[in-house]
Swiss-Prot record:
GO MF: glycosyltransferase activity
UniProt GO cellular component terms: plasma membrane
Gene3D superfamilies recorded: Spore Coat Polysaccharide Biosynthesis Protein SpsA, Chain A (3.90.550.10)
TM annotation in the entry: 3-23, 164-184, 277-297, 330-350
InterPro entries in the record: Glyco_trans_2-like (IPR001173), Nucleotide-diphossugar_trans (IPR029044)
Keywords assigned by UniProt, alphabetized: Carotenoid biosynthesis, Cell membrane, Glycosyltransferase, Membrane, Transferase, Transmembrane, Transmembrane helix
Name of the protein this chain belongs to: 4,4'-diaponeurosporenoate glycosyltransferase
Function, as annotated: Catalyzes the glycosylation of 4,4'-diaponeurosporenoate, i.e. the esterification of glucose at the C1'' position with the carboxyl group of 4,4'-diaponeurosporenic acid, to form glycosyl-4,4'-diaponeurosporenoate. This is a step in the biosynthesis of staphyloxanthin, an orange pigment present in most staphylococci strains.
Name of the gene encoding the protein in the UniProt record: crtQ
Topology class, membrane: Multi-pass membrane protein
Pathway: Carotenoid biosynthesis; staphyloxanthin biosynthesis; staphyloxanthin from farnesyl diphosphate: step 4/5
Length: 375
């Protein structure tokens, strides 16, 4: 069995080499004080039954050092979303249904929101997002100024978990970031065509020139469509990590919501990752199974060194934790038990593939979305 021990060790070593390459290029926001004394930004928040989350976002906006306009696009909420938003001084606008009823959801709400914005600079922020620092909005504006106030800037918030089950989002969050290609030196350096969805910043002129969210009217993951629309007009598209400025809490409704949410996300997300980066990601993930397999076999067969296989497992685990700490705050127990996370990720991936290729639809927040047109 020593030969098997050597093979598994080599596989894990190759896996970790891939892990070192998939996220070795950082894109971090840099703090900057701008001292605006006028409202230089309109924040548009699409909201559908967000009464339990939107208050945290609005409170963090109030704490910002620069004044902003806030528009909450109430997309058919049946709870107290509108009342909560008004209590924080936000302007609440009810989303008007599309004439033919075929365009609905986040992209529809965002597009309507722009018509109510009084500033040229606009940001779209999901209701489950929170600004962690008082200079967060200033930092976003400064970063946008550094790209000449042109194009699209997007941020993937740092994931803060409050319940144990929320940690099962760990691999999905990491894949969301590294799947953008630009965070790896394996990327060929060509123009980025994708954007994160939770936080985006742009200007009205470029927004309307590209079609804005209208370009995403048939898409579930609107960031990809937005990024492609801006790139087609030769406008810059940039992506950044959220920590330590922007965070979110995901799928707090329960484990079922988490499964449905990531099934929806994976249904269209994987196709944007370049083949060589996807190959590196797959090999890195396979290291989780190879490392636990070696450890389990060493406990059964004396020919395999338990100490060696434990070292291999802990080495992979250390890298696994290190990479995930960049994108979120997750349970240490789940991080150590990463094979469980890998198996859950695989389950959702297969489920998403079936819904994409067999059924052509996914359900989210009581609505069905066709995904056949996004492939």
């Amino acid at each position: 069995m020593k030969w098997l021990s050597r093979i598994l060790t080599v596989i894990v070593a190759m896996s970790m080499a891939c892990g070192a390459l998939i996220f070795n290029r950082r894109h971090q926001l840099k703090a900057k004080t701008l001292n605006f004394n006028h409202k230089s930004l309109t924040i548009i928040i699409p909201a559908r039954n967000e009464e339990k989350r939107i208050g945290h976002l609005l409170h963090s906006i109030i704490q910002q050092q620069v004044p902003v306009d806030v528009i909450v696009m109430n997309d058919g909420s049946t709870d107290e979303t509108a009342r909560v938003a008004r209590s924080y001084g936000a302007t609440v606008v009810d989303v008007v249904d599309d004439a033919d009823g075929k365009w609905y959801g986040k992209s529809h709400a965002c597009y309507q929101g722009v018509t109510h914005a009084c500033t040229n600079r606009i940001a779209f922020v999901d209701a489950d997002v929170t600004f962690l620092r008082k200079d967060a909005v200033e930092t976003l504006i400064n970063q946008y100024q550094l790209q000449g106030e042109k194009g699209l800037l997007s941020v993937q918030p740092y994931h803060i978990t409050k319940r144990f089950y929320e940690g099962f989002s760990a691999i999905f969050n990491l894949m969301t970031v590294v799947g953008m290609n630009v965070f790896s030196t394996l990327d060929d350096g060509r123009t980025n065509q994708h954007a994160f969805g939770p936080v985006t910043l742009t200007n009205k002129e470029d927004y309307y020139a590209t079609g804005g969210h209208k370009s995403a009217n048939r898409h579930i993951i609107e960031g990809f469509a937005l990024g492609s629309a801006y790139t087609s007009q030769s406008l810059p598209v940039t992506v950044y990590e959220g920590f330590p400025f922007v965070a979110f809490c995901m799928y707090q409704e329960g484990f079922q919501s988490l499964q449905e949410g990531w099934t929806k996300h994976l249904s269209t997300g994987a196709g944007g990752t370049k083949p060589k980066i996807m190959a590196a990601i797959v090999l890195w993930l396979f290291g989780s199974i190879a490392s636990i397999l070696g450890l389990c076999l060493s406990l059964k067969y004396r020919q395999m060194s338990v100490g060696k296989m434990l070292t291999v497992y802990l080495s992979y685990t250390t890298q696994f934790i290190y990479l995930h700490r960049r994108v979120g705050q997750f349970s240490n127990l789940l991080m150590v038990c990463h094979p469980l996370l890998f198996m859950f990720f695989t389950k959702i991936f297969i489920q998403s593939w079936k819904q994409t290729h067999r059924y052509g639809v996914v359900e989210w927040k009581g609505r069905q979305y066709s995904i056949s047109k996004e492939q």
